[in-house]
């Protein structure tokens, strides 16, 4: 249901009619085929109900897979989808159930794996998200969005992080999003006078704030925990995410729900 809300808010007011397919994969080829109908009904019940409330059509698709990531990319590439939206899983979520699951997993790691010298990065949220994001982005032939749920309800106060000329594509997504939510957006420009394409970046942001209502340029130039005060959604590029997830880990503890986008 949350992923449906994200997709609707991000794309319902785009140039093209919104056509959605909800894909659910069960990992493990030993699933009894007689049980798949029941799995499908249970899996898609909430999202079909949500789509009906929003007044949109949605296709549902259930697959059994031995390698979910590879199969998702294969479906996207072979069947001509023009955007892939995936969830980041529980590792970066701050919902109570997900936090409990993460704590359990950390406890399980400490109790059972450390004695075998297993690499702790297996259970490190940043590494897990980075690996998943990298795979989808590198193997998909369309733009990819990886959604991190931090109690998402509505993207009404959006922060858009710009670090290079390549990040300006985010402003187009922000403009479409605001048409759906009628909210506001603020741009945090991390670029400096020595950043390649600095003038193009300034012009792009200026044009965005002049042309799109309820948009502003923030005075600050760096991400801190306080940067996210008052915001409930962040748009950030995959490249910039990789940088801030490495160098601004403390700030990201306070981040709102986030969509990490590839061009």
Where are these regions (language model features)?
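Short, well-structured alpha-helical segments in soluble
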Residues: 71-79, 224-226
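Short beta-strand elements in bilobed, periplasmic/extracellular small-molecule ligand-binding domains
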Residues: 54-61, 185-188
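Charged docking surfaces used in two-component/phosphorelay signaling
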Residues: 63-69
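Intrinsically disordered or low-complexity boundary/linker segments at protein termini
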Residues: 1, 87-196, 202-263
């Amino acid at each position: 249901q949350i992923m449906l809300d994200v997709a609707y808010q991000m794309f319902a007011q785009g140039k093209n009619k919104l056509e959605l397919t909800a894909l659910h994969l069960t990992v493990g080829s030993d699933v009894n085929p007689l049980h798949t109908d029941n799995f499908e009904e249970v899996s898609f019940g909430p999202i079909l109900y949500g789509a009906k409330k929003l007044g949109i059509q949605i296709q549902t698709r259930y697959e059994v897979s031995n390698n979910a990531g590879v199969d998702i990319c294969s479906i996207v590439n072979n069947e001509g989808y023009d955007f892939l939206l995936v969830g980041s899983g529980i590792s970066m979520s701050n919902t109570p159930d997900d936090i409990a699951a993460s704590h359990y997993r950390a406890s399980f790691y400490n109790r059972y794996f450390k004695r075998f010298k297993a690499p702790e990065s297996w259970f490190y949220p940043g590494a897990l998200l980075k690996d998943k994001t990298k795979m989808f982005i590198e193997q998909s032939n369309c733009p990819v969005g990886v959604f991190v749920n931090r109690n998402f309800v509505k993207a009404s106060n959006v922060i858009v992080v710009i670090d290079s000329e390549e990040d300006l594509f985010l402003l187009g997504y922000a403009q479409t999003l605001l048409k759906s939510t009628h909210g506001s957006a603020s741009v945090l420009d991390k670029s400096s006078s020595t950043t390649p394409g600095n003038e193009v970046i300034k012009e792009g942001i200026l044009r965005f704030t002049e042309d799109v209502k309820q948009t502003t340029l923030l005075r600050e130039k760096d991400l801190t925990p306080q940067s996210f005060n008052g915001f409930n959604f962040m748009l950030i590029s995959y490249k910039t995410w990789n940088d801030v997830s490495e160098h601004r880990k403390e700030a990201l503890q306070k981040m709102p729900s986030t969509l990490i986008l590839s061009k």
